[in-house]
């Protein structure tokens, strides 16, 4: 059973309308990711899907983030990684990318704040300015605005297993 968390579709739709290119990075095999995203009707939002078998390295190694940033031709200073696990935060830090961590999702029962991400949020809709009320949107410290208006949001492995590392509830069954 897969359930998309509240606000996920709205957030992905809004980011897409803003021209934000999004990628999904997961340690799970790539062949399972796209069908699940399509089943949940959110696959179209992701330009790149990087599975655990796409590259030789897996998170927390930053190789997948570097790969996506190279493909998007966007520097780390204009990228944002959304995740819900220690591996996500470590990968983002190693790539020099700011990381927004979701307080719910996959982190082996440990508070994600222990990993010291750039910011911890409880609702993905905080990525949408004004969605949860005036002034509710997030502001990351020292962000370098993109001159072209394009940026990339890299979402992680649970985006198909938890959709955006907390976006969906799904129990892996081998």
Description of each model-found segment:
Residues 81-119:
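Acidic, Mg2+-coordinating phosphoryl-transfer loop and its flanking beta/alpha structural elements
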Residues 1-24, 30-34, 62:
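Short, acidic loop-to-helix structural element flanking the phosphoryl-transfer center
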Residues 58-90:
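Conserved Lys-Pro-Asp/Glu-containing loop-to-beta segment of HAD-superfamily phosphomonoesterases
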Residues 27, 53, 85, 102-106, ...:
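Short secondary-structure boundary segments
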Residues 18-20, 72-78, 134:
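Glycine-rich phosphate-binding loop signature in dinucleotide/nucleotide-binding domains
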Residues 150-174:
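Membrane-proximal basic amphipathic "stem/tether" segments
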Residues 42-47, 75, 121:
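Conserved H-loop
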């Amino acid at each position: 059973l897969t359930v998309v968390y509240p606000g996920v579709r709205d957030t992905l739709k809004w980011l897409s309308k803003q021209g934000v290119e999004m990628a999904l990075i997961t340690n799970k095999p790539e062949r399972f990711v796209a069908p699940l995203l399509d089943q949940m009707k959110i696959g179209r939002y992701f330009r790149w899907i990087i599975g655990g078998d796409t590259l030789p390295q897996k998170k927390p190694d930053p190789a997948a983030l570097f790969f996506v940033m190279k493909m998007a031709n966007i520097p780390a200073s204009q990228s944002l990684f959304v995740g819900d696990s220690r591996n996500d935060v470590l990968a983002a830090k190693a790539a020099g990318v700011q990381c927004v961590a979701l307080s719910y999702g996959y982190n082996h029962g440990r508070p994600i704040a222990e990993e010291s991400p750039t910011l911890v949020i409880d609702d993905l809709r905080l990525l949408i300015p004004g969605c949860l009320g005036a002034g509710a949107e997030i502001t990351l410290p020292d962000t370098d605005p993109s001159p072209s208006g394009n940026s990339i949001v890299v979402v992680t492995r649970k985006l198909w297993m938890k959709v955006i590392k907390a976006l969906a509830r799904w129990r892996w069954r081998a």
